[in-house]
Swiss-Prot record:
PROSITE patterns attached to this UniProt entry: TRUD
Catalytic residues (UniProt): 339
Function in brief: Pseudouridine synthase that catalyzes pseudouridylation of mRNAs.
Organism listed in the record: Mus musculus
Protein name (database record): Pseudouridylate synthase PUS7L
Annotated SUPFAM superfamilies: Pseudouridine synthase (SSF55120)
Domain called TRUD: residue spans: 424-646
Taxonomic lineage: Eukaryota, Metazoa, Chordata, Craniata, Vertebrata
PANTHER family listed in its UniProt record: PSEUDOURIDYLATE SYNTHASE PUS7L (PTHR13326:SF21), TRNA PSEUDOURIDINE SYNTHASE D (PTHR13326)
Gene3D superfamilies associated with the record: TruD, catalytic domain
Annotated EC: 5.4.99.-
Residue spans of biased composition, Basic and acidic residues class: 96-109
Length: 702
C-alpha cells in the first residue's frame, strides 16, 4: 500500500470489493448529520431511557471500606534512642483525607496526640513480642546503625543484620514486622522461612540526604502504615530543583506504590515561592493492600451512565468529566471510542463517584456540549469491546454524480446501497483511527512506543500542526526548547491531555525515564490506543495486499472463522487454516476470512500474506518485537478481524428541495435527479467504521 511521505496512510489507496460506480456527497457537514448510538450487549440502544425502577439507588449503600486495622501514624520526631521530642509540633505529618482547613494549632495537636499514642503502641508491641534479650539486642543494633550513619561511615557489604528468631505464627510475625518498622523506620525487616531478620534501610538513608531525618522517618512510617485515603506532606521548600530531586527519588523508588504532587505552601507568594510535596498511595497500591483478593470490586463505588457528547473526542470528554468530578481519567471505563465530529451516545462507568455526585454536574457539563443520563449504581467497570455494535443515523448532503458520469443519480445511489447490503465492504480501520488530516498520526506514536523510543514518542505527540493557534504555538515552543514548564504556561487549559503530559515532564524531566513517567499521566486505555493504531495500520495494509494477491477467492493458507457472530477477540482455537482440498472444493467464502491484528498470541496466514506480515515488521524494525512494553505496562496479545463485513437494518430516504417552497421533501425511490441529500440508517458490529462503509458505497474518500 502506498504511504504519504510523513508515514501516514493514504486512505485512497485502499481497495473496494464492489463494482458499482458510486456517487459523491458531503458527510459530517455538522455534528447532527452524523449520529452514533452504541448498542449494548443485550442489543439495546444506550440512548433509550432505562426503567428507573430497575436501578433504584439504595439509600443505605456504603462507601468503600476504610477498615484497615493499622493505627493512623503521624510520628515524625522519633529519634533512634527515643529521647528528644522537642520540635515535633513543627513537623509536617500524614492525615486521613483533606485537612487543609485546619488551623496550625489543630494540626499540631492532632499530630502530637497520635504520635504519643503510636510511640507507646510500638514500644509495647515489641516488648510483648520479643524476649528481653532479643529486645535489648534490637535496640543496640538500631543504635549501632544510627551511629554509623551519623559518623558518615558507609555500610559494609553484605549489610549488617540481626535475627529476631523464628516466629511460627504467621499473624504474630506480621505484627512484629510492622512494629519494628514503626519503632525504627530506618530499619527494614525480611522474612526467611519463619525467621524475622532486621537490616538497615538504605533507602531511608538516601532520603535523609534530601530531606530532614524527621521527615524521612515520618515518610517511612507512613509508607509502612498503608493507611487508606491518607496523605503525607513534607515541609514547604522554596527550592524548585530540590523539590524536583525529591519527586524523582520518591517516584523512582516507590512510584508503583505512591504518587507525589507539589502544592503551594501556606505562606506562598511571588517573594516566597515555597511549595510542599504531598504523597498519597496510588489507588491500585491501596487496593492490593487494603482488601482481600477479589473483594475490592464489591466495596468500590461504580456509577454507570450514558454519555452524550457533541464534537468532542472520547478522551477529551473524559478529561473534562474527570476535572469536574475530582477523579482521574483512568477512573472511567467504556466499551469503545466514538467519533469526534458527531453526536454520540455511549455507555460509561466511573469509579469512586456516586450517582448523586454525577447528577450534580449535569448543568455544568451541558456548557461543554455533553450530557449524562441513565445514571445508576453498578458492581463493576466496563471493558473495551463490551458492546454489540453501533447504530448510525447519517445525512449525506450535496449529492452528485461521479466525474464524467451522466447516469441517473438516484439509480446510482440505490445501486450502491443494495450492493453494500448484499456484498459488504472491506472492514478497514477508519481514517479517524490514525488522526485524519494530522501531520503526525497515532500509528507513528505507537511504532515509537513499541520500539521503546519514549522521548521520540513524546515529541511526536507534541508535534504541532501547520495552524497558527495557541495550542500549536505551545507545541512549537516545546520542540524548540524542551521547556515543559514554559510550555505549560502557553498551553490552553482545555487541552487536558497535553497539560497532563507536560506537568509530568516538568516534574520528571525530558529523559527516557522521565518520558516513561509522563506516559503514565494517561490512562492505560489511552497508552495502548497508540499501539493498537500501529497494529491497525498494518492490518489495513495486509487486507489490501490479501485482496490484491488473491481477490475474493479463499486460498490455501488463509485463516477463516466460520462464526460470523464471533467478536474480534475470539481465540486462535476458533481459527482454521484452509487446506488445499478446501480451496479446491470452494468450502469457504471471503466473508469468513480473517487476518491477524498484531500481537504476541496470534497465528499468521501460511501463504504470501503471512510472508508479507514478516516483511512489514522487518521494514519497521520490529522483526524481534514481542508486543510487550514493560516500561508502560502494556501487553498486546493481538486478535483477528474479518476482512469483509455487512451493514444490518439498512434503511434510506432521499430528500429533495421543493421548487415552490425551497423546503426539503422526502420522496420514494423513483425521485428525479434533483436529490440534494440522502438520509441513511444502519447498524454495524463493534469496531466497524461507518465512514469505511460509506466509502465503499460512494466509491471515494470521505
Amino acid at each position: 500500500m502506498a504511504e504519504d511521505t510523513d508515514g501516514g496512510i493514504r486512505f485512497n489507496s485502499l481497495c473496494f470489493i464492489n463494482d458499482h460506480v458510486g456517487f459523491q456527497g458531503s458527510i459530517k457537514t455538522s455534528p447532527s448529520d452524523f449520529i452514533v448510538i452504541e448498542i449494548d450487549e443485550q442489543g439495546q440502544l444506550v440512548s433509550k431511557a432505562t426503567d428507573g425502577s430497575l436501578y433504584e439507588i439504595s439509600k443505605i449503600q456504603s462507601e468503600p471500606s476504610n477498615s484497615v486495622k493499622k493505627p493512623k501514624l503521624n510520628i515524625q520526631n522519633v529519634s533512634l534512642e527515643h529521647k528528644n521530642s522537642e520540635g515535633a509540633a513543627d513537623l509536617p505529618g500524614c492525615s486521613d483525607g483533606d485537612r487543609s482547613h485546619q488551623s496550625d494549632s489543630e494540626k499540631e495537636n492532632s499530630v502530637n496526640s497520635v504520635t504519643s499514642k503510636c510511640e507507646e503502641e510500638s514500644v509495647d508491641l515489641l516488648r510483648s513480642l520479643l524476649d528481653e534479650k532479643t529486645h535489648t539486642s534490637l535496640g543496640q543494633f538500631a543504635c549501632d546503625i544510627k551511629r554509623m550513619w551519623n559518623s558518615q561511615t558507609e555500610l559494609t557489604e553484605p549489610s549488617p543484620e540481626l535475627s529476631l528468631g523464628k516466629i511460627l505464627d504467621k499473624n504474630r510475625r506480621a505484627v512484629l514486622h510492622s512494629a519494628v518498622r514503626q519503632a525504627f523506620p530506618f530499619l527494614i525487616t525480611v522474612g526467611n522461612q519463619g525467621e524475622v531478620v532486621v537490616k538497615p534501610n538504605r533507602e531511608c538513608k538516601e532520603l535523609c540526604r534530601l530531606v530532614s531525618e524527621e521527615e524521612a522517618l515520618g515518610f517511612f512510617k507512613y509508607l509502612d502504615a498503608k493507611k487508606e485515603n491518607s496523605k503525607f506532606t513534607f515541609k514547604p521548600d522554596p527550592n524548585k530543583d530540590h523539590r524536583k530531586a525529591v519527586h524523582h527519588f520518591l517516584n523512582k523508588k516507590f512510584g508503583n506504590l505512591v504518587e507525589t504532587k507539589s502544592f503551594p505552601g501556606q505562606h506562598h507568594s511571588a517573594g516566597n515561592p515555597d511549595s510542599a510535596i504531598t504523597v498519597r498511595f496510588r489507588e491500585k497500591a491501596r487496593g492490593k493492600r487494603s482488601h482481600p483478593e477479589g473483594c475490592e470490586r464489591g466495596k468500590a463505588v461504580y456509577t454507570a451512565f450514558t454519555l452524550q457528547k457533541e464534537n468532542l473526542e472520547t478522551f477529551e470528554a473524559i478529561g473534562l468529566l474527570a476535572v469536574k468530578l475530582g477523579v482521574i481519567p483512568s477512573d472511567f471505563s467504556y466499551a469503545g471510542l466514538k467519533d469526534k465530529r458527531a453526536i454520540t451516545y455511549q455507555s460509561m462507568v466511573v469509579k469512586k463517584v456516586t450517582p448523586e455526585r454525577l447528577k450534580s454536574i449535569k448543568e455544568e457539563i451541558e456548557k461543554k456540549r455533553m450530557n449524562v443520563f441513565n445514571i445508576r449504581s453498578v458492581g463493576d467497570c466496563l471493558r473495551l469491546g463490551q458492546l454489540k455494535g453501533n447504530h448510525f443515523e447519517i445525512i449525506i448532503r450535496h449529492l452528485r454524480n461521479q466525474l464524467n458520469d451522466s447516469a441517473n443519480l438516484t439509480e446510482r445511489i440505490l445501486e450502491a446501497i443494495e450492493n453494500v447490503k448484499n456484498k459488504g465492504f472491506v472492514n478497514y480501520y477508519g481514517p479517524q483511527r490514525f488522526g485524519k488530516g494530522q501531520k503526525i498520526q497515532t500509528d507513528q506514536i505507537g511504532l515509537a512506543l513499541l520500539k521503546n523510543e519514549m522521548v521520540k514518542a513524546i515529541k511526536l505527540f507534541l508535534t504541532p500542526e501547520d495552524v497558527d493557534d495557541p495550542v500549536n504555538k505551545a507545541k512549537q515552543y516545546f520542540l524548540r526548547t524542551e521547556d515543559a514548564k514554559g510550555t505549560l504556561s502557553l498551553m490552553p487549559e482545555f487541552r487536558v491531555r497535553e497539560r497532563a503530559l507536560l506537568e509530568s515532564l516538568h516534574r520528571f524531566g525530558v529523559t527516557e525515564e522521565g518520558c516513561v513517567r509522563a506516559w503514565f499521566s494517561f490512562p492505560h486505555s489511552m497508552r495502548i490506543f497508540y499501539i493498537h493504531a500501529y497494529s491497525s495500520r498494518i492490518w489495513n495494509e495486509a487486507a489490501s495486499y490479501r485482496l490484491a494477491a488473491y481477490g475474493p477467492k479463499v486460498v490455501e493458507g488463509d485463516l477463516i472463522c466460520s462464526d460470523e457472530d464471533a467478536d474480534k477477540h475470539f481465540p486462535s482455537s476458533k481459527v482454521h487454516l484452509v487446506t488445499k482440498e478446501e480451496e479446491s472444493a470452494h468450502t469457504y467464502a471471503l466473508h469468513q476470512v480473517v487476518l491477524p491484528v498484531l500481537g504476541y498470541n496470534v497465528q499468521y496466514p501460511e501463504n504470501q500474506v503471512g510472508r508479507w506480515y514478516q516483511e512489514a515488521l522487518s521494514r519497521d524494525g520490529l522483526q524481534a518485537c514481542r508486543f510487550r512494553v514493560p516500561a508502560l505496562k502494556l501487553n498486546v496479545p493481538g486478535c483477528y478481524r474479518h476482512i469483509v463485513k455487512h451493514p444490518r437494518n439498512v434503511s434510506h430516504r432521499l430528500v429533495h428541495p421543493d421548487p415552490a417552497t425551497e423546503e426539503a421533501r422526502v420522496e420514494g425511490p423513483h425521485s428525479d435527479d434533483t436529490a440534494s441529500s440522502l438520509s441513511l440508517s444502519f447498524d454495524l458490529d463493534a469496531s466497524c467504521y461507518a465512514t469505511v462503509c460509506l466509502r465503499e458505497m460512494m466509491k471515494g474518500d470521505i
